[in-house]
Amino acid sequence: MTFVRELEVASQNSRAFNVTLWFIFIFGLLKLVPFALRFLSMVFDLFVLPPVNYAKYGCKAGDYAVVTGASDGIGKEFASQLASKGFNLVLISRTESKLVALKDELEGKFNIKAKILAIDISADSKDNYNKIYSLCDDLPISILVNNVGQSHSIPVPFLATEEEEMRNIITINNTATLMITQIIAPIIIRTVKKHRESGDKKLKSQRGLILTMGSFGGLIPTPLLATYSGSKAFLQNWSSSLAGELAADNVDVELVLSYLVTSAMSKVRRTSMMIPNPRTFVKSTLRNIGRRCGAQDRYGTITPFWSHAIYHFVIEELFGVYARVVNEINYKFHKSIRIRAVRKAVREAKQN
């Protein structure tokens, strides 16, 4: 007698068996349907929906976008691509010469206005924050990009992390991000309200936007990058909470999650299917603002680059970001990076 035939006989002779089968079917349906809907939503976000129209954020109204960490890498790309959409810019970074060069380039190329401020954010200086306020308070600002960030120089055990590095990571990734947002967000709210009440039909649906750069290091607990991982995980809850607070003020708040991107901070130089360059990553981010992409279960969060989104989705759905196996794989990955970095440092020391 075949297995199917045995099921048929059991079904005919046992009501309890039938009830059990229906329970299994309904339970499976309740699990599979949401999974399928989340997967289809991700695919739709990434590959079907058209790019976001930035007119709703004031690109045609002469509004400004503030970009921190603007002189290199991802921050520089945010500045360039926002300028290409018509936004004026406030560029904040450490190196004045780079800011001047970028200002001249973008003003000449895109016929926009750019203001610059060279400050060392790691100093956590009240004077720095006053300078930001003085520069920005009178400007019509509709976008803030919290891009400035710092990681460890190489993967390192928490107990071996130098105090200065630990303090700098927390100051730059957390304290400065909160302080700058507390300065700029009221200006964004004011700008949006003024546009919406102006009577101009083109501005009646005006919105503001606050983007904060997150990381898979904050999504997934990351041994050997413990301080950095914790600082980015903090941004997840803070940004999502802020999204709820500012929704009534017509300000969209998004945490942008990325895996590896070629940059000075990641120390990765070669692009691949999993590792885009800053231009490609920022293009994906600006294209998909307001959509979850790979972060289907996370409010106010976006994993915009397609391979990062799929990777995020698989980890969340199959294992969970806090699973032991994910933690162990992450530890082995960063341990191998640390070993190579230490060997390289030893070789360079011998050569010198």
Swiss-Prot record:
Main location: endoplasmic reticulum
Single GO molecular function: very-long-chain 3-oxoacyl-CoA reductase activity
Binding site for NADP(+): V66, D120, N147, Y228, K232, V261, S263
Family: Belongs to the short-chain dehydrogenases/reductases (SDR) family.
Entry-linked InterPro entries: 3_ketoreductase_fungal, NAD(P)-bd_dom_sf, Sc_DH/Rdtase_CS, SDR_fam
A GO biological process held by the record: very long-chain fatty acid biosynthetic process
Pathways per UniProt: Lipid metabolism; fatty acid biosynthesis
Membrane topology: Single-pass membrane protein
PROSITE patterns: ADH_SHORT (PS00061)
Subcellular location: Endoplasmic reticulum membrane
EC number: 1.1.1.330
Key words of the record: Endoplasmic reticulum, Fatty acid biosynthesis, Fatty acid metabolism, Lipid biosynthesis, Lipid metabolism, Membrane, NADP, Oxidoreductase, Transmembrane, Transmembrane helix
Reactions catalysed, as given in the entry: a very-long-chain (3R)-3-hydroxyacyl-CoA + NADP(+) = a very-long-chain 3-oxoacyl-CoA + NADPH + H(+)
Segments passing through the bilayer: 20-40
Pfam families in the record: adh_short
The protein's name in its UniProt record: Very-long-chain 3-oxoacyl-CoA reductase
Active site: Y228 (proton donor), K232 (lowers pka of active site tyr)
Uppermost EC category: oxidoreductase
Organism: Candida glabrata (strain ATCC 2001 / BCRC 20586 / JCM 3761 / NBRC 0622 / NRRL Y-65 / CBS 138) (Yeast)
